[in-house]
Structures are given as structure tokens and as C-alpha cells.
Amino acid sequence: MMKKCILGLVAGLTLGANIAMAAENIYPISREMGSGTRGAFTEIFGIQKELKGKKIDATTTKAEVTNSTGVMMTTVANSKNAIGYISLGSLNDTVKAISVEGVMPSVENINNKSYKISRPFNVVIKKSNPLIEDFLAYSINAKAIIEKSGYIATKTKKFVSKKPKGKLVIAGSSSITPLMEKLVESYKSVNPNVVIEIQQSDSTTGVNVVVEGIADIGMVSREVKEAELKRGISVRVLAIDGLAIIVNKANPITNITKDSVYKIFTGEMTTWDQVK
């Protein structure tokens, strides 16, 4: 009898611990305003509200704001109850990606359209020149580099550089920056006559500095807005990227519904025991 009571007590304590953990507060982590990743995320999951006929971001003010992909991942990796979102190509083993509606984020699942949470990696320019055209032609058709980095290439034409001389300044999205760094390094091996500077910030800044003539190429990790196009820029798709929902590796959750993501990031769902 004593043994049964002890076992029952241990089981009860274990169950209680699990319930307590499951009911812990959710710690939503967001990207900053102006981030293309945030823009794509809020649009895909409908985390928006109407204001004077326009849809605006409705992310809860209780979410912690991070200013880059790297900071997002570090924050989630260091908090057991955190949940955030990143570029699929940036995913590493410091955090855990979870499935959405039962489908894991992967290049294969984006290609077969079972995982629908994806967005374009765009580049924008205002003024063109032979160096810009040569570099973009190389980058957009760099299928091996794009796919090895975890993204989906959209074009595969054969490229022969004309090796123009000059300097390029490329600025914008922190999500696109890691891929762009690889493309720049590879392009320099084909065309050693070029100097290329990359300035990491966010997608909106990427558009603004191109419009203002500060940068030659802007990196935009979301759809380019109609109002931005009216400022005289043109857009090209560099690659397709998935968005991954990430949690701490100690979190037992493996799947989440789109509705739960919406409710977490609008502040309607605040504890893990509510998550479906």
C-alpha cells in the first residue's frame, strides 16, 4: 500500500509538472517594423487590421522586437517559451522549426506546394548600368548557390560575364544578406574587376536607399508595394524562400495551426496549453 501511495504521489507530481509547463506564458518574438520577413509573415497569417481603408500590422505590443534574423534566433534559443519566425534558409540547429498544419517547412514541400508559407526574395534597382545587369544576371541564374543555401531558384540560364569594372553598393534585408554574401563572393571569382559593399538593414531601408541613390541594389524579402514601385524602382525575383516558425529546442511542441499562430501574434493566445 505504501509503495502504491508513493508511486501515485510521484505520478501526480510528474503530471502536475507537465501541466504547469504546458500552461506557461508564450513569449512571442517579432521582427522590427520595416522588416520584409515581418511584412511577409503578417500578410501570410493575416496578422493585420483595417485602418482608414488600409491593412496595417496588428502584431501584439507584448511581442519582443528583434532587429535581425540572427538576433531573432538567439532570442528564441535562449528562452524556453519563445516562438518566432525566420527565413527557412537561415535555419540552423540552435532552434527548432515546427510544422504548420502538419507540414514541415522544406524546399521540397514548397516546391510541391504542400507548404504554402513562402515569399519572394526580391532585388530592386532604380538606375541600371552594365555592372548592375551583369551581377544580377549572374545572381538570379546561380541555381547551385541558391539551392545549396536552402532557397528555390527561379531561373537557370547560362551566364557569361562581360566583366565590367566598378563598384556596387547592395543594401537591405538581413534575411537576404547571407545568400547575397555567397553570391557576391562567387561573382568576384568570375569578375575580379568589381568592388561590392553589402549593407545589412531591412527591406524598407533597402528600397529607400535605392530611391535616394545611396545604394545600387536593394534587398527586399517580401512583395514590393505598389507605392514603392511608383517611386521609380523596378523589381526582380532573386529566389523563393520559405518562412519557418521556430521555438526553443526544449519546447515539446512539434506542430501548430495557422489560427494559433495568428492568435499568438495578435495577443489572443497567451499560454502554451491553448496552442493547437
Where does each model-flagged region fall?
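Exported/periplasmic ABC-transporter solute-binding proteins
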Residues: 21-276
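Bacterial N-terminal signal peptides
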Residues: 8-17
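Positively charged n-region of N-terminal signal peptides that target proteins for export
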Residues: 1-5
